[in-house]
Amino acid sequence: MKLRLSVALLAILVAGTASAQHSAQKVNIGIKGGLNIYNINNDNNTEYDAKPGFNVGLLGHIHLSRQLALQPELVYSLQGAKYTVSNVDTKINLGYINVPVLVQYMFDNGFRLQAGPQVGFLVNAKSKTGSVSVDIKDDVKPVDFALSAGIGYVHPASGFGIDARYNLGLSDINENASFKSTNRGAQLGVFYLFNHKR
């Protein structure tokens, strides 16, 4: 079900950007990837530490005016956290397909401010202690909502760029627990816009 939904979202992204490109010639499709530093914030006494991960996916950059743009993305993101009990480390690995839709304000020098909502669809969830890995997907809610904000830069002549953002989780990711846990993390990555103009 989640795979079909992800494919449908990808089809909408590609079709929508292609249609807009045909009508306005102000749309770019791109690829992106980068590093995650994520953590889990919770209401109980567990002290989580940030854990590195990665993200990779597609984006569409839609010019609304000279200064404003809309950027929907379809990204696989490895998130989670880690904690230590009695000198034993446990990693929580949460894999999401995230769909942020960002409004961007574009400066003439290539810099961009961006912010917008994000919805994430859980793909996999595992808890790993030493060499033992346990599937915890049933303990994590299938959909996550967040707000994203950050800054980016695209080289006007080439279409290559860098992107930094912070994602603040808004919804409880615990399926069964009596306490609330939310995702939050920072991302740093690179991207490339095909047929980039301005």
Q: Which role fits each region the language model picked out?
A:
Residues 31-35, 54-64, 74-76, 99-105, ...:
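Residues on the lipid-exposed face of transmembrane beta-strands in outer-membrane beta-barrel proteins
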Residues 82-115:
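Helix-adjacent hinge/juxtasegments
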Residues 1-27, 32, 190, 194:
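Bacterial Sec-dependent N-terminal signal peptides
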